[in-house]
Amino acid sequence: MDFFILEQRSREEFDMVNDILHHACTGAIIALLFSTPKKTWFYLLLGAAAALLPDVTKELFQDSLLHSLIAAPFAAALFAGILKTIFKKEPFMRIFGSFLAAFVFGHLLLDLIDNGNAIFYPFVKEELEYSIISKSTPLVWIIALAAISAGLAFKRIRLLSAAGILTILLYIGFQAAAKEMVTNALHERYTFPNAAITVFPTGEWPWEAMNWSYHA
């Protein structure tokens, strides 16, 4: 019994670390598209922080407001204004754009395609989801981290960040197509009228044999 408790705890800790890296690395690589050669680390850290912010406030205040698309531009404007007072020479719109992009694409939309998100809170309080990426997969942050590392090493940070983002988008597209194929196959197998079949990813890697599960 102790072994199973320890294993479950280890799994929960892995999932937590994986989730942090999932958002932080994605936010960082998105924000780096806005970077300049002298401000690479500024935008890298800004993007990581922006993408983690919704979960920080959720854990501290048990509130879903910053998981909403509606709150995103206001949060970005607030933090961009604060950062502008510190980094006076940096254009406000560049800070705002990088923060907003990392916030939305590095967290809100990632949540939407893995475990769901109340993306229209407070007008729609239910979590919406289109699960095509398993919460346990490290593939997204591995791609992002590899692209960032290569960009820093070869001093082509924006180019290789764009390449990393394109690779992630191709992976998401592959997962979306795979989900549709599995869903169509299940509808052909279960020919009940108006059958509601929900397909969701379970594997850590897209090449695993048991990568999808479902409930009807």
Model-derived regions: residue spans:
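N-terminal membrane-targeting hydrophobic helices
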Residues: D2-V199
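Exposed beta-strand-loop-beta-strand "reactive/processing" segments of non-cytosolic proteins
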Residues: A196-A216
